[in-house]
Amino acid sequence: LIAQLTYPEWDYRRKDYHAQQCRVMFQEAEEGGDLWIPDLQARRLFRKVQRQFEALRPKREVLRGQLDGVELDIDALVRAQCDFLANGSSSDHIYIKSHQQARDLAVAILVDVSLSTDSWVSNRRILDIEKEALITLASGLATCRDTFSIYTFTSRKKHHVRVTAIKHFNETFNSQVLRRIAALRPGYYTRMGAALRHTCQLLSKRPERHRLLLLLSDGKPN
């Protein structure tokens, strides 16, 4: 158990919050589970998504007409020479500088593992669809080298909302994380508000300029 924290909860009847209404049990994921081996269709999907994310990967930005740099900007140099011959003065901004663009993004993925995800759609269990979607998304974010974390949530009652860390922000996306995803099991109820507030709190501590929370759920309250 990492921590126990309390959060308010919205009452739609009163149109107000109940202070300190829910208790979140924040814990580490179990290390069990076999390494998930994707089938041919899933591998094709992974490759497709990775190609799409590769297009978003930060590239080197070339800045021309700079005061200093490791390479001369020929166009700027010619203009400067022409200006000097014409009026006796010219600009010193005759260099090219390049630097790596930064996306500066942190993403928190929150996954619903309540009992309703044990239902079946088109001959597939919802939780298995969630796992495949989660791995696909995480692979894409890893391709972009974005900082991201993965958490799951379920609840027994308002004093026991379980949020589990599958991957922390400072962890790499590796086979150990894949095993944790493979070990996910459905159970209990969908108390979403406290889990969202806890994930928002974790995300708010990140130094990145842009922060994104993604909720992966079947949308069915249990």
Q: Model-derived features: where do they sit?
A:
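DG-centered beta-turn motif at the end of beta-strands
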Residues: 111-113, 134, 199, 208-222
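Substrate-binding beta-hairpin/strand module that engages nucleic acids
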Residues: 146-163
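Von Willebrand factor
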Residues: 159-162, 166-210
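Negatively charged
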Residues: 1-78, 88-106, 121-122
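…and closely analogous acidic/polar surface helices at protein-protein or active-site interfaces
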Residues: 117-148, 199
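Glycine- and acidic
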Residues: 30-35, 113-124, 178-185
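MIDAS-like acidic motif and immediate structural context at the N-terminus
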Residues: 98-126, 217-218
